[in-house]
C-alpha cells in the first residue's frame, strides 16, 4: 500500500511538469494531431524513414545530443520543390529522437518508449521552424494580400511567392472547420458558465485570441487560394503545351496527306504509262516502241487530267512561290494563254495583238500565229496542236511544228527576197466557221472540239472534217427547265441576281454585265455570255452569263442538269470524276458534288474571279487582285503568289503540277514555281 501510494505520488509529481511543459505548445500539439492520421501511419513512416536513410544516414545508436541533432536535421529551409525529402527529414527526426524508432538490440526489436522530455524538445524545435516559416512567408508575400479590394492582384502575387512545405501543409490541412468547431464550443462553454441574466460578452483577451485565430485562418485561406491558383496556372501551361503539340502533329498530318495525294497522282501517271507500254508492245511491230514516243488516240487531254508532269530536276532548285520568269508584251491586257508542258511551248494572246508563241525553256518569242482579224479570247494547246477562238467568230487550228519554218520564210520575205511564203508552211491547218458572233470559250481533245460563243450556242466540231456535228442552244435550255434543271438541287436563301429558270427573255439581245471593280479600281462591261466549257467523253459542262452551270450529254445534245447558286455570270470552271469547281463575277468559287449536285464548299474573295484551275491538292485562282490565290484543299488555307509578280490584276492562268503561268492587265506573263 505504501509503495503503491508512493508510486502514484511519484507519477503525479512527474506528470505535472510534463503537462506544464506541454501547455505552451497546445497549438503545436493540435497541428501534429491533425497531421498524425496522414503522416504517422506505419507505411508512411517506414517509407519516409527509408528515403531519409538514403539521403542522410542516421546512426544506429542513440545520439547523445538529441536536440542539437534535431536542429541540424530540421534547420534546412523546407519548400514545396521537394516535399518528400522534407517530410522524410521530419519523420526521421521524430522517429529517432522521440523514441518511436525501432533499433535492433540483441536480435530483438526495442519496444516503443513513453513520451519524454526529448519529445518536448522536438516539438519545440518544430514550433520554431513553423514560426520561422510563417515569418519568411509573411515577408515574401505582399502586405496587400489581405486587402479584399485587390483579390485578383493578391492571388497573382501570392502565386509567384515561394511557399514553404510546413506553411503550405499547415494551410492546406482542413483546420478551418476544426477552428470553427473549437470557437463554437468555447462560446457554448462560456454561455453555460454565465447565468441567463448576464450579458453574453467575451472578454478582451478572448476576443483577441479569436481575432488572431481568424487572422491566421484568413492567411491560410489566402495561401490555399494562391496554391490552387498556381496549380491552375501550371495546368494551363501544360494544356497550352499539349495544344501546341497537337497543332504541330496536325500540321505534320496535313503534310503527310499532301504527300499521299502527290504520290497517288504520280502513281496514276506511272500506271497509265505502264498500260500504254504494254499496249504498244502487244501491237504488231511495237516491240521497239517506247511509251513516251506518242500518245494513243483518245488518251485524254493533259489540260484537265490530274496526273502530274514529271518536271526537270532543276525545277526543284527554284524558290517556291516566286516568279522566276517574266515575259513582257507591252501591247495590252492578256486575254488568253496556255502551254503544252512545263518548259515547253507557251501560246499567248493579248488585246489588239496577234497570237504569240514562246519557248518557256529560254523565254524567247519564237513567232506569231497570224490569221485572226479580231482579239483572241480563248485558246488551248495539246502537244503540237493549238486551237484559238476569236471575236471574229472563227476557230483556227494551228500546227506548232510549222512555226519556225513559217517565221523564217516571213523574215526572208520582209528582207526583200520577194518570194511568197509557201502555203504548206502556214501553221494554220484548219479554219472553222459557224458561229454568228464572237467565240469566248473552247475545249478540244484530239478529234473533238466544243466551242461557246456570244450567239448563246454551244457547237461540237469534228476536227477531221472541220464540220459542226451538234449545236446546243442555251436559251432553249433556259426556256425548258423541266429538261435542263435538276429540281432536287436546293436553291440558296438569297435568290440569284440572274434567274436562269425564268429569265431567258432577258438574254435574247446582246449580253452585257457590269463587272465589279478590281483591286486597282478598274472595271468594264462583261460581254462573254459563255464563260467556260469543258468536256470529258460524252459529258460536257458549260458556265454562262445567266449564272448557271449546265451539264450536257453530247450524245443527245440535251442539258440534263443545271447547278444553281452563283448570282453573277460564270467566268471559269473545271471538273474531274467527282467534283466541279466554278468561278464567277459574284466573287466566289464553288465546289460542287457531281453525284448529288450540292455545294460542298464556297470560297469567298474580295474581287471577281476570272480564272481558276485545280488538282487533288490545290485550287489556283485569279480573283481580281495582283496576287494569285493558292488554296490548299487539305489544310483549307490560302496563300498568295505575289513576289516578283504582277503590278495589275491577274485575269488568266494555267497550272500544271508545280508549274503555273499567269497573265495580267499589266501586259506581262509570269512563270511561277509552286
Curated annotation (Swiss-Prot):
Gene that this sequence comes from: MDV1
Topological category with respect to the lipid bilayer: Peripheral membrane protein
Annotated segments matching region Disordered: 1-25
Organism (species): Malassezia globosa (strain ATCC MYA-4612 / CBS 7966) (Dandruff-associated fungus)
Coiled-coil residue windows: 202-260
Upper classification of the organism: Eukaryota, Fungi, Dikarya, Basidiomycota, Ustilaginomycotina
Alphabetized UniProt keyword annotations: Coiled coil, Membrane, Mitochondrion, Mitochondrion outer membrane, Repeat, WD repeat
Biased composition (Polar residues): 1-18
A Pfam family of this chain: WD40
Repeat region (WD), residues: 329-368, 371-408, 434-471, 519-562, 565-604, 606-641, 645-674
UniProt superkingdom: Eukaryota
Family to which the UniProt record says this protein belongs: Belongs to the WD repeat MDV1/CAF4 family.
Keyword Mitochondrion: yes
Database matches in SMART domains: WD40
GO CC terms in record: mitochondrial outer membrane; nucleus; transferase complex
Main location as per UniProt: mitochondrion
Compartment(s) of residence: Mitochondrion outer membrane
UniProt-recorded name of the protein: Mitochondrial division protein 1
Amino acid at each position: 500500500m505504501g509503495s503503491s501510494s508512493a508510486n502514484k505520488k511519484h507519477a503525479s509529481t512527474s506528470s505535472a511538469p510534463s503537462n506544464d511543459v506541454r501547455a505552451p505548445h497546445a497549438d503545436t500539439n493540435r497541428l501534429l494531431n491533425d497531421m498524425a492520421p496522414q503522416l504517422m501511419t506505419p507505411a508512411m513512416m517506414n517509407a519516409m524513414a527509408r528515403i531519409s536513410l538514403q539521403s542522410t544516414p542516421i546512426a544506429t545508436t542513440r545520439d547523445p545530443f538529441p536536440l542539437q541533432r534535431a536542429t541540424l536535421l530540421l534547420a534546412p529551409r523546407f519548400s514545396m520543390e521537394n516535399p518528400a525529402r522534407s517530410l522524410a527529414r521530419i519523420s526521421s527526426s521524430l522517429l529517432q529522437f522521440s523514441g518511436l524508432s525501432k533499433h535492433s538490440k540483441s536480435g530483438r526489436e526495442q519496444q516503443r518508449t513513453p513520451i519524454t522530455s526529448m519529445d518536448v524538445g522536438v516539438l519545440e524545435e518544430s514550433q520554431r521552424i513553423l514560426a520561422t516559416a510563417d515569418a519568411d512567408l509573411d515577408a515574401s508575400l505582399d502586405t496587400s494580400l489581405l486587402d479584399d479590394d485587390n483579390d485578383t492582384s493578391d492571388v497573382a502575387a501570392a502565386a509567384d511567392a515561394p511557399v514553404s512545405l510546413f506553411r503550405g501543409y499547415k494551410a492546406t490541412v482542413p483546420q478551418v472547420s476544426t477552428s470553427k468547431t473549437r470557437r463554437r464550443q468555447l462560446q457554448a462553454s462560456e454561455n453555460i458558465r454565465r447565468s441567463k441574466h448576464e450579458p453574453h460578452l467575451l472578454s478582451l483577451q478572448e476576443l483577441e485570441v479569436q481575432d488572431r485565430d481568424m487572422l491566421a485562418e484568413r492567411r491560410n485561406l489566402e495561401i490555399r487560394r494562391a496554391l490552387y491558383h498556381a496549380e491552375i496556372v501550371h495546368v494551363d501551361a501544360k494544356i497550352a503545351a499539349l495544344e501546341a503539340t497537337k497543332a504541330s502533329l496536325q500540321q505534320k498530318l496535313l503534310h503527310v496527306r499532301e504527300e499521299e495525294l502527290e504520290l497517288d497522282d504520280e502513281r496514276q501517271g506511272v500506271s497509265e504509262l505502264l498500260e500504254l507500254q504494254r499496249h504498244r508492245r502487244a501491237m504488231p511491230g511495237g516491240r521497239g516502241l517506247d511509251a513516251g514516243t506518242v500518245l494513243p488516240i483518245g488518251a485524254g487531254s493533259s489540260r484537265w487530267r490530274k496526273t502530274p508532269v514529271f518536271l526537270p530536276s532543276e525545277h526543284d532548285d527554284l524558290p517556291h512561290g516566286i516568279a522566276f520568269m517574266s515575259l513582257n508584251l507591252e501591247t495590252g491586257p492578256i486575254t488568253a494563254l496556255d502551254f503544252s508542258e512545263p518548259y515547253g511551248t507557251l501560246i499567248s494572246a493579248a488585246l489588239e495583238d496577234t497570237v504569240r508563241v514562246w519557248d518557256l525553256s529560254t523565254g524567247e518569242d519564237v513567232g506569231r500565229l497570224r490569221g485572226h482579224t479580231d482579239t483572241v479570247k480563248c485558246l488551248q494547246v495539246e502537244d503540237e496542236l493549238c486551237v484559238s477562238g476569236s471575236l471574229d467568230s472563227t476557230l483556227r487550228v494551228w500546227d506548232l511544228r510549222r512555226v519556225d519554218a513559217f517565221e523564217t520564210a516571213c523574215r526572208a520575205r520582209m528582207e526583200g527576197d520577194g518570194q511568197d511564203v509557201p502555203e504548206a508552211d502556214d501553221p494554220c491547218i484548219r479554219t472553222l466557221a459557224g458561229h454568228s458572233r464572237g467565240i469566248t470559250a473552247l475545249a478540244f481533245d484530239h478529234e473533238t472540239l466544243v466551242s461557246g460563243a456570244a450567239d448563246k450556242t454551244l457547237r461540237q466540231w469534228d476536227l477531221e472534217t472541220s464540220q459542226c456535228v451538234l449545236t446546243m442552244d442555251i436559251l432553249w435550255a433556259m426556256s425548258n427547265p423541266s429538261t435542263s434543271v435538276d429540281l432536287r438541287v436546293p436553291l440558296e436563301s438569297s435568290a440569284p441576281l440572274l434567274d436562269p429558270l425564268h429569265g431567258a427573255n432577258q438574254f435574247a439581245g446582246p449580253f452585257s454585265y457590269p463587272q465589279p471593280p478590281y483591286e486597282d479600281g478598274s472595271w468594264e462591261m462583261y460581254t462573254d455570255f459563255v464563260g467556260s466549257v469543258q468536256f470529258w467523253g460524252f459529258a460536257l459542262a458549260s458556265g454562262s452569263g445567266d449564272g448557271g452551270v449546265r451539264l450536257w450529254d453530247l450524245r443527245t445534245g440535251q442539258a440534263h442538269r443545271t447547278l444553281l447558286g452563283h448570282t453573277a455570270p460564270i467566268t471559269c470552271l473545271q471538273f474531274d470524276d467527282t467534283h466541279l469547281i466554278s468561278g464567277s463575277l459574284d466573287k466566289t468559287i464553288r465546289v460542287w458534288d457531281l453525284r448529288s449536285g450540292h455545294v460542298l464548299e464556297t470560297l469567298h474573295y474580295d474581287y471577281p474571279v476570272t480564272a481558276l484551275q485545280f488538282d487533288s491538292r490545290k485550287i489556283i485562282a485569279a480573283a481580281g487582285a495582283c496576287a494569285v490565290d493558292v488554296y490548299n484543299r487539305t489544310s483549307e488555307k490560302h496563300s498568295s503568289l505575289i513576289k516578283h509578280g504582277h503590278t495589275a490584276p491577274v485575269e488568266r492562268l494555267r497550272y500544271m503540277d508545280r508549274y503555273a503561268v499567269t497573265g495580267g492587265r499589266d501586259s506581262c506573263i509570269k512563270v511561277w514555281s509552286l
